């Protein structure tokens, strides 16, 4: 009987420590992901023939099992030109950068939802063969939302959308990435 009580006590102690360590397990965890970004740029109904493409980098920190914070950096770029009979008349370049951050809520052990708020910066430069050149840049509010999936405890799949309006230029950016959770 004494042996059985000791076994029950040790088993209960191990179970309690296991449960406590599961709660602590998510606290302080981080993840980093890198991925593909593609923007769609519109101005007064006109859009670029080819979408600017680039990359996205995200870092996430979990405060506890439910809440965390995420930071994001995105960059997309597209060069373009107008030619007549192989003769280049106009050369242009569009670049977009954003830095955003926001809260993360873990729905379950596999899925988390997050919101983003920060700054988006766009720069367009156009030059012609006649020596004329024009450049415009604008920084404005950027906001978005996304999901992170953890199909495996150490693997992250990230998908998000971000929007920014730079005066009359509207930039919507889709991002898809993968990363490591540690």
Swiss-Prot record:
Q: How does it sit in the membrane?
A: Multi-pass membrane protein
Q: Where is the signal peptide?
A: 1-26
* Entry-linked PROSITE patterns: ENT_VIR_OMP_1, ENT_VIR_OMP_2
Keyword list, A-Z: Cell outer membrane, Membrane, Signal, Transmembrane, Transmembrane beta strand, Virulence
For whether the record's keyword set contains Metal-binding, the answer is no
* InterPro entries according to UniProt: Bact_OM_Invasion-Related, Enterovir_OMP, OMP/PagP_b-brl, OMP_b-brl
Cellular component terms per the entry's GO annotation: cell outer membrane; host outer membrane
Q: Which SUPFAM superfamilies match?
A: OMPA-like
Kindly list the places in or outside the cell where this protein is found, as annotated in its UniProt entry. Cell outer membrane
Among its keywords, does the record have Amino-acid biosynthesis? no
Q: Which domain of life is it from?
A: Bacteria
Reported function:
Promotes the invasion of pathogenic bacteria into eukaryotic cells by an unknown mechanism.
Q: Which family does it belong to?
A: Belongs to the outer membrane OOP (TC 1.B.6) superfamily. Ail family.
* Protein name (record): Attachment invasion locus protein
Question: From which source organism is this entry?
Answer: Yersinia pseudotuberculosis serotype I (strain IP32953)
């Amino acid at each position: 009987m004494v042996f059985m009580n000791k076994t029950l006590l040790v088993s209960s102690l191990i179970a309690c420590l296991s449960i406590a360590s599961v709660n602590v397990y998510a606290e302080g965890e981080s993840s980093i992901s890198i991925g593909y970004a593609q923007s769609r740029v519109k101005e007064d109904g006109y859009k670029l023939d080819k979408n600017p493409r680039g990359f996205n980098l995200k870092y996430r920190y979990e405060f506890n099992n439910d809440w965390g914070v995420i930071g994001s950096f995105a960059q997309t770029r597209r060069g373009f030109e107008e030619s007549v009979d192989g003769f280049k008349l106009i050369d242009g370049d569009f670049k977009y950068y954003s830095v955003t951050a926001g809260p993360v809520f873990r729905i379950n052990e596999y899925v988390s939802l997050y919101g983003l708020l920060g700054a988006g910066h766009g720069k367009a430069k156009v030059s012609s063969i006649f020596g004329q050149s024009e450049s415009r840049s604008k920084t404005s509010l950027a906001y978005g939302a996304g999901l992170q999936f953890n199909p495996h405890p150490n693997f992250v799949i990230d998908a998000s959308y971000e929007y920014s309006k730079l005066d009359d230029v509207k930039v919507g950016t889709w991002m898809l990435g993968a990363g490591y959770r540690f």
